[in-house]
């Protein structure tokens, strides 16, 4: 049985971008209808309950300075923030040696260099800093609206980040630290990503240190009640009649005087058809490319989706009765070249109970460990925690993980990235409407691309595009 519905604008995807676009359209007096494949809203933002009314964020979670759009939206919805726990000494495990320090790795204070010297030489830290400064200078030359128009766009887009790092660093340790940072920000390896994409993304986020930093950086704060509160509240405001869950869009007919979206109906054998004046596709480019379009999309747009793979990440939470590491003067933050969780944060609730160690498996290690049994992954992650924080870390009360590449309607995280040649050959198609079809999603943002703030920007932009177009129509 096929249910038939009509709307002014059909929106594919109930993540932040799709819900913000719907909100903008509703404010303009239009009737949007959001179709979401999952049985929930939020997309790559997801809370998991851990008891006592508390949650951990198994998807996107942080907000930092300069992310004005998501900050304003959260404030309007009444969602407050609290600081990521950053007090105490951070741990770094490198080449089989361990050091503790306070501050950021890119800080050049003498006391930090001294503290780190057991694991990382002063020469390697200086090497890292000179390359980071050069990278930031290059990034500022990349136009955020048109990365392909950068002065050396083709040269930069024709090489991987790995190639650039090898040419611009002198120490193996600095190269390894750039690898760790690439995994942490893009959930990919330096060999996977175009240098131009790294530069665009760095400029988009306000500099390399801001991307990787906690205090003063992109990981500075979290949301009370978890980040998924924001899309949940947006969906509540939108109203159930404007949102359909369990409705993956399979085919979009577009052209003439409207669009027709064909989706599953939520029950076995059921189908849903939505007729609208225009459509916004607010899912990652990889997933947008899996929808069938009639007529087919222009070659440039279709091939773009073939050249924007998603990163790979497994997000783990080891949950303890209390954050015992704090009593030992540790922040809970750690970086390790051994892994498998190479980046660790204290992800405890704001009152510090229970204690939560968040461990990320990213890039190559996420691909390797994602193919292994869950029990084996858990054992390896906890062994790494114990190596860093002591044997007590090997015995959590509960262990939670999310393998985002296994999610049918996600297939990876944190977001899509550009491979070599992607920006200069296909980038013009990323945001450009195709007739009655418009594109949204964090990857299409020009500021804080790939982040929740970028998702909000993209939803506002796509909603405004369509509202203006329908005024003319």
List the model feature ranges, each with a label.
Residues 1-473:
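FAD-dinucleotide binding site
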């Amino acid at each position: 049985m096929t249910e038939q519905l009509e709307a002014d604008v059909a929106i594919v995807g109930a993540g932040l971008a799709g819900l913000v676009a719907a909100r903008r359209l509703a404010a303009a007096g239009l009737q949007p209808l959001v179709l979401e494949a999952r049985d929930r809203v939020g997309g790559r933002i997801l809370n998991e309950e851990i008891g006592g009314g508390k949650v951990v964020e198994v998807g996107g979670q942080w907000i930092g300075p300069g992310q004005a759009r998501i900050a304003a939206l959260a404030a309007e919805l009444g969602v407050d923030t609290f600081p990521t726990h950053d007090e105490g000494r951070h741990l770094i495990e490198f080449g089989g040696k361990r050091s503790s320090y306070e501050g950021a790795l890119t800080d050049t204070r003498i006391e930090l260099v001294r503290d780190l010297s057991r694991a990382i030489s002063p020469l390697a830290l200086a090497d890292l800093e000179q390359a980071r400064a050069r990278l930031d200078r290059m990034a500022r030359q990349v136009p955020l609206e048109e990365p392909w128009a950068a002065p050396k766009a083709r040269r930069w887009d024709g090489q991987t980040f790995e190639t650039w790092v090898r040419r611009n660093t002198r120490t193996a340790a600095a190269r390894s630290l750039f690898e760790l940072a690439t995994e942490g920000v893009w959930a990919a390896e330096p060999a996977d990503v175009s240098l131009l994409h790294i530069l665009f993304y760095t400029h988009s986020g306000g500099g390399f240190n801001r991307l990787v930093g906690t205090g003063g950086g992109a990981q500075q704060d979290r949301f009370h009640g978890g980040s998924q509160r924001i899309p949940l509240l947006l969906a509540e405001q939108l109203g159930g009649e404007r949102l359909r869950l369990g409705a993956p869009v399979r085919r979009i007919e577009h052209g003439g005087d409207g669009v027709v979206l064909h989706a599953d109906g939520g029950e076995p054998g059921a189908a849903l058809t939505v007729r609208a004046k225009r459509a916004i596709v607010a899912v990652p480019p990889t997933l947008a490319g899996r929808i069938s379009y009639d007529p087919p999309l222009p070659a440039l747009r279709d091939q773009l989706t073939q050249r924007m793979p998603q990163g790979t990440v497994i997000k783990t939470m080891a949950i303890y009765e209390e954050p015992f590491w704090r009593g030992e003067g540790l922040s809970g933050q750690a970086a390790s070249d051994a892994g498998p969780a190479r980046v660790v944060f204290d992800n405890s609730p704001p009152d510090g109970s229970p204690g939560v160690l968040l461990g990320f498996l990213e890039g190559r290690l996420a691909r390797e460990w994602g193919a292994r049994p869950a029990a084996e992954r858990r054992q390896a992650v906890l062994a790494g925690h114990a190596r860093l924080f002591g044997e007590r870390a090997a015995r959590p009360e509960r262990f939670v993980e999310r393998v985002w590449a296994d999610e049918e309607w996600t297939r990876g995280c944190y977001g899509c990235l550009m491979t070599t040649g992607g920006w200069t050959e296909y980038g013009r198609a990323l945001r450009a409407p195709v007739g009655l079809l418009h594109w949204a999603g964090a990857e299409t943002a020009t500021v804080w691309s790939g982040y929740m703030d970028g998702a909000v920007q993209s939803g506002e932009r796509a909603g405004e595009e369509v509202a203006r177009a329908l005024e003319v129509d």
